[in-house]
Amino acid sequence: MARKLSKNVKNAKAQVNKTDVFSLLEAIELAKKISFAKFDESLDIAINLNLDTRKSDQQLRGAVALPHGTGKNVKVLVATDEVSAQKAAKDAGADYVYTAAELPEVLNQDKYDFDVIVADPKMMLVLGKYGKKLGPKGLMPNPKTGTVTTNPAKAVEELKKGKANYRADKGGIIHASVGKKSMDSQKLVENAETLIQTIKRLKPTTVKGTYVLNITVSTSMGPSIKVKID
């Protein structure tokens, strides 16, 4: 199996010239064309930025609503003690709604059946105790991604419609999924453009010189394909 996978990866890479640069649509269509996985891979984008993430004002992190969703059914857990907020969250499509008293039993489990936690600010006292467990899994709620909020129902609606979370790593590169391979290419382009334009608008004032260094797209298991920067 490993040999077959290695061969597939080599074949996919052989179809991409590292020096070639494509329009966003061309890059996405090529990524889909050379995909060899038998499952519906994510279509990922990597945006390399001229950032010094040691500086607090250059640590980009947030979430953006994608016009055509992510193609993924996101399971959302809402944490709140407010009865009205609990009902509103359920009506909005939350998969799980728990109070502060109920959270420990859920969070102490080895495996979780949810992708995102949306929390009322008051719940952070409880959730903070599980930071070492939730943080590495990317599950700790954060105001910058809209997952710490006094309006959990609205956050649930946005997550269910499809939001892309983004965060610059230590090297200043933002990795995000903008949809699934099975989605229409033009819709994937519009999703990717939404993220790119959002990142451009968030350029820190302290950044000097070229801001966006390069952009690549790929499927989950495919090679990176360079995109022209406008």
Curated annotation (Swiss-Prot):
Superkingdom of source: Bacteria
Gene Ontology cellular component list: large ribosomal subunit
A Pfam family this chain is assigned to: Ribosomal_L1
Gene Ontology biological process terms from the UniProt entry: regulation of translation; translation
Keywords: Repressor, Ribonucleoprotein, Ribosomal protein, RNA-binding, rRNA-binding, Translation regulation, tRNA-binding
GO MF, any single term: structural constituent of ribosome
UniProt xrefs under PROSITE patterns: RIBOSOMAL_L1
Xref: Gene3D superfamilies: 3.30.190.20, 3.40.50.790
Subunit structure: Part of the 50S ribosomal subunit.
HAMAP family: Ribosomal_uL1_B (MF_01318_B)
Family statement drawn from the similarity comment of this UniProt entry: Belongs to the universal ribosomal protein uL1 family.
Role, per record: Binds directly to 23S rRNA. The L1 stalk is quite mobile in the ribosome, and is involved in E site tRNA release. Protein L1 is also a translational repressor protein, it controls the translation of the L11 operon by binding to its mRNA.
UniProt protein name: Large ribosomal subunit protein uL1
Organism: Metamycoplasma arthritidis (strain 158L3-1) (Mycoplasma arthritidis)
Gene field: rplA
